[in-house]
Structure formats: C-alpha cells, structure tokens
C-alpha cells in the first residue's frame, strides 16, 4: 500500500516522499523494513525517543507530533488519532462496512454486549463481538487482553468480521480506549451508556476526566441509549448531536421502562414497556442489575430494527456470561458464585442483589488490584463490611505492590462495619476458609476475578482459575 493512501484521512502539512508501506506499528519492538512507525507518548514511554532508531531500522516513514529530525517525517497534531486512522486505512476501512454498536459504562458492559450478541444469534443476524472476555469474528474466537483492543488489532478484527459476513460488531468501549483515541475515525450506529461510578481514577486522575472520556462515545454515534436511572445520565446526554433514547426502572419519564420487577435466586422477571409495546421478560441471570443489562440490550436490538416480540423471546432465552454472577457446580447445600465485581458500585450491586434472594449468610471473598486506584480500597472494604455477613479480605491481582499493604488499605474502611472480618492474603486459603464455614443456604461470593484465569503477582502472571480452585478444595486436593 502507498503511504499517501494511508494518510488520506490524516491532517498534515508535511511534505513527504510517497512510497510503498509493508506494515504499520506504534511499538518499537515491531519496527520492520518499509513500515510506518507512529510515535506515541504514553505514561511510561515516549515513542518519539526512538524515531531515529526506527529510521535506521528501515522504517519508510515516521509520524510524530513535532520535528524529530528524520528524513521522511510526517507531523500531525495527534499521533493517537493519526494511528487510529491509518490502521483503518491499512485494513481497508472495515468499520465502514459494519454497523457498530458500542457499550460504555463502569459496570455491565460485558453482560450487555453478550446479551445483544445472544439476541442477534437467536434472530440469525450475523455479528461479531469485542470485549473483556473474548473477541468473536464470525466463526473465530480469541481470548481478550484488553476490553477494547489497540487501534491496529481493532481494525484487524473488524476486517475479519467483514470477511466472515458479519453485519454488526457489538463491542465494549472502555474509557481508556476513548481517551487514547483507539476508536478515532470510527462511527457508531448505536451507543449505550450503562452507568458511571468510581473506577480507573489511577489512569484518568479525576472523576470529571473519567466522565468526559465516556461521553466521547456519544459524540461519534447516530443513536444514544442512556440509562436514565444513573445519576450521571445528564452528563452523557447534555447537548448531544445525536438522537437519544432513555430507559429505566425508577421513573416513567423514559422511552423504555421496566415494571413489575421480580428477583429470584436464579432469575429476574419484568415487563418491558415502550410507547407501542409491552413484553414480559424472564431471564435466567440473577441480580437486579440484570434488569438494566437485559433492558439495555433489548433496546439496542429494537433500535437496530429487530422485531419487538422476537427480541423479548430472545432475551428470555439468553444465558449468563462467564464470571458474571456465575454459579459454580459444587453439589453442596450452599452456593458458590464467581463475579467480576471489582469496584465499589460493582460490589454493592452484586451483594445487594444477593441479599434480596438469599436465606442464609453472604460470605464474600474479595481484594483490590495493585498498581490501581488506591482511593477505592477502603470504600470497597466498607461496602462489603456493611452488606455481607462475613468478609474475607484477600489478594486480587497485587501486581508490583505488597499484598499485605493492599489488605491494610482495604481494612481502613472496615473499622466500624457489622460483618465478621477474616484476613487471608493467599487467595486460595481465603476461598478454602470461606467454603469451610459455609452452611446450608449460604452464598459464598468470590468477587473480583470473574472470567480471569490468571493472577498477576510481583513475579509475573500465573495460571489461576477459581473454578479449578473450588473443585480442588471439594476434592480435598487443597
């Protein structure tokens, strides 16, 4: 491909030498002969510092935000934006051949995108999926490493979806991806807002920056679908240039609403109302938050043109998502659940929902991630301490931090809580303890890791699957 073709949608005043391009990259360890190297300044590394090295290694051109003294340099205002656009051009602008449905918010993104995918599958609408658990491009599936892939991988996945005949791409769009411009140049047919609570402040710095990043998605879409019950809904919808639809449970002043909500230990039931229709949903995923996730998914499908009654039927047939209120097969008189809840709001939602349907005690095993926002640790501790009967504080993904110090931060918020508190830094020991004290009717909630099958320690990433841990405990292997 010619360099000039890659730069068609990139604004630059630079005079450059047109040439054949073999590849594009923003990673210094992927520089090859005849590639285009894009200099991106991150939190820990500035690609501009290796621009000369890229030229010496045979890069055909270097894209930068300022003069870097190489022969074939292209200066742009934002290399992140430019990288996203040239990646799209490199793969033939595949997003233009797909209808994009993006879901953003602190909690509920994964479940909502899976539910939309399930609905489309039931209705024989071929679609791809991009998100936290896995990426699906028609007949192929890949394990995910990021909620929203980097620009190059994202465009590659789009292209694979197009090649496999997908009509839609349903994707989680993280705040980091929006802030870093990974979806710059993409236009979404439908964008859904689930909710906004404290998370990722280690990256964004302030809650205002976090909210601002989320809002970006609704500035590049045709139709916005907003959870009106969330207190920050107004931040998302204020002065939007697109058409806005709202949904909710707490008010009648929405386009779509849920009435007669009933929560059971293994399901939720409710009536979905629109100005023209009413449908009864009975979905086998427990928790009050399931009402919001499934309603948001149904609204997106209806706005995409699907028949209302068919959508209602498809939602009711949908199954749960790995690591989201996932019931572990234990054959015991108590229940073991695995859930990805790793924020204050996420923990509050899942424990509060369990309280509605649990006759026995709620025993919660949880920790907080290392090298992440420290301010949410005592908040998470307080929430679990106030809502659970027994709180077992342990490790999550400590990363480079001392796990004992992370636990200490969590305990700061649990000084006056009602729950019994046990601290066991080793997560396996914590799970074993929780299961050993569980009685008939109790729920053991393993919170934080969800679908993850690894744990990140200061020595690196190790295999760690809580389903396997639970099975081994029951077999007496641990």
Regions found by a protein language model. Give the residues of each.
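Short internal beta-strands
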Residues: 60-66, 224-228, 365-366, 389-397
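Phosphate-binding loop of NTP-binding sites
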Residues: 7-10, 83-224, 228, 232-243, ...
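N-terminal leader/targeting and accessory segments in enzymes
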Residues: 1-85, 89, 223, 257-262, ...
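Short, well-ordered alpha-helix to beta-strand connector turns
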Residues: 21, 33-34, 59, 70-71, ...
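Acidic, Mg2+-coordinating active-site environments of NTP-dependent enzymes
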Residues: 5, 64-70, 164, 188-336, ...
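ATP-dependent carboxylate-amine ligase
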Residues: 1-12, 33-36, 46, 241-243, ...
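A short acidic, helix-capping loop that chelates divalent metal ions and anchors anionic groups
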Residues: 70-71, 136-142, 198-203, 372, ...
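Short, ordered loop/turn segments at secondary-structure junctions
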Residues: 66-68, 132-133, 175, 196, ...
């Amino acid at each position: 491909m010619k360099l000039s073709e890659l730069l068609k949608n990139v604004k630059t005043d630079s005079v450059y030498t047109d040439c054949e391009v073999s590849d594009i990259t923003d990673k210094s360890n992927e520089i090859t002969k005849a590639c285009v190297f894009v200099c991106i300044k991150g939190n820990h590394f500035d690609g501009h510092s290796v621009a000369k090295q890229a030229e010496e290694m045979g890069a055909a051109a270097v894209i930068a935000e300022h003069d870097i003294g190489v022969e074939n340099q292209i200066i742009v205002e934002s290399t992140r934006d430019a990288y996203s656009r040239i990646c799209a051009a490199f793969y033939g602008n595949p997003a233009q051949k797909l209808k994009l449905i993006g879901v953003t918010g602190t909690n509920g993104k994964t479940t909502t995108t899976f539910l939309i995918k399930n609905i489309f599958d039931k209705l024989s609408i071929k679609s791809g999926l991009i998100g936290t658990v896995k990426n699906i491009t028609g007949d192929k599936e890949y394990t995910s490493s990021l909620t929203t892939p980097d620009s190059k991988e994202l465009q590659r996945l789009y292209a694979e979806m197009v090649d496999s005949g997908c009509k839609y791409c349903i994707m989680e769009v993280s705040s980091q991806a929006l802030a870093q411009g990974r979806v710059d140049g993409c236009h979404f047919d439908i964008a859904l807002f689930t909710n906004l609570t404290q998370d990722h402040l280690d990256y964004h710095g302030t809650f205002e920056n976090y909210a601002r990043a989320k809002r970006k998605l609704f500035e590049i879409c045709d139709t916005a679908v907003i959870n009106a019950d969330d207190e920050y809904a107004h931040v998302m919808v204020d002065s939007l240039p697109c058409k806005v639809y709202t949904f909710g449970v707490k008010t009648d002043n929405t386009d779509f609403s849920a009435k007669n909500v009933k929560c059971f230990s293994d399901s939720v039931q409710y009536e979905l109302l629109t100005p023209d229709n009413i449908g009864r949903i009975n979905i086998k995923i427990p928790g009050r938050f399931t009402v919001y996730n499934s309603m948001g998914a149904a609204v997106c499908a209806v706005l995409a043109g699907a028949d209302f009654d068919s959508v209602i039927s498809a939602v009711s047939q949908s199954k749960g998502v790995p690591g989201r209120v996932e019931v572990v097969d234990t054959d015991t008189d108590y229940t073991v659940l695995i859930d990805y809840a790793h924020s204050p709001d996420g923990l509050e939602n899942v424990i509060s929902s369990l309280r509605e349907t649990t006759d026995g005690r709620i025993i919660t095993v949880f920790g907080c991630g290392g090298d992440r926002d420290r301010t949410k640790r005592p908040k998470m501790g307080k929430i679990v301490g106030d809502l659970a009967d027994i709180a077992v504080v342990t490790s999550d993904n400590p990363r480079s931090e001392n796990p004992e110090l992370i636990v200490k931060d969590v305990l700061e918020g649990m000084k006056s809580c009602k729950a019994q508190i046990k601290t066991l830094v080793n997560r396996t020991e914590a799970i074993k303890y929780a299961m050993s004290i569980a009685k008939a009717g109790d729920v053991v909630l393993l919170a934080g890791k969800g679908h993850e099958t690894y744990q990140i320690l200061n020595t690196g990433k190790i295999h760690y699957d809580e389903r396997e841990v639970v099975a081994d405990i029951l077999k007496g292997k641990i």
